[in-house]
Design a protein with these regions (language model features):
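Small-residue (primarily alanine) positions within well-ordered alpha-helices
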Residues: 14, 18-19, 23, 107
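Glycine-rich FAD pyrophosphate-binding loop
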Residues: 7-9, 20-43
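A secondary-structure boundary/capping signal
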Residues: 9-12, 34, 95, 116
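Short, basic and Ser/Thr-rich N-terminal targeting/leader segments
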Residues: 2, 67-70, 116, 126
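Conserved N-terminal helical subregion
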Residues: 74-129
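Beta1/beta-strand and adjacent pyrophosphate-binding region of the FAD-binding site
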Residues: 1-14
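N-terminal FAD cofactor-binding segment of flavoenzymes
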Residues: 39-73
């Protein structure tokens, strides 16, 4: 039976980033993703601040970067609206499927193992099933 220091259930962005950081510290990490592919299905709209990505150690590539948003017009149910403009804080639209794959690659390069089409049913005293 294979043994790992850490087993992470779910290959979402948070699971993959956790795997990346834990593996960087020298621990053996296994990520179990029940889906057939990392990044599917898409669970988020993909709007993130450029500074947040930078802080998390993610630099968008040409595949992950879709566009940049400098302003937004938000409508309330009453019909009133507010416009938000930003010269400092940039919000970018990312392709979440590709972003997840980019972070998965970073996790693997840090030493984590990722298994797709693999879930687990329960935690036991001897491990997981």
């Amino acid at each position: 039976m294979e043994e790992y220091d850490v087993v992470i259930a779910g290959g979402s962005i948070s699971g993959l980033m956790s795997a990346r950081e834990i593996a960087k510290k020298g621990h053996s990490v296994l990520v179990l993703e029940e889906g057939f592919e990392i990044g599917t299905p898409d669970h988020c709209g993909g709007l993130v601040s450029k500074s947040a990505l930078h802080e998390l150690g993610i630099e968008p590539t040409q595949k992950t970067f879709d566009s940049m948003i400098n302003s937004a017009l938000i409508y309330a149910p009453s019909g009133k609206s507010i416009e938000i403009n930003s010269k400092k804080q940039k919000v970018i639209v990312v392709n979440r499927r590709e972003l997840d794959k980019q972070v998965a690659l970073q996790a693997q390069q840090s030493g984590a193992e990722i298994r797709v089409k693999t879930g687990f049913k329960e935690k036991t005293k001897r491990g997981i099933k």
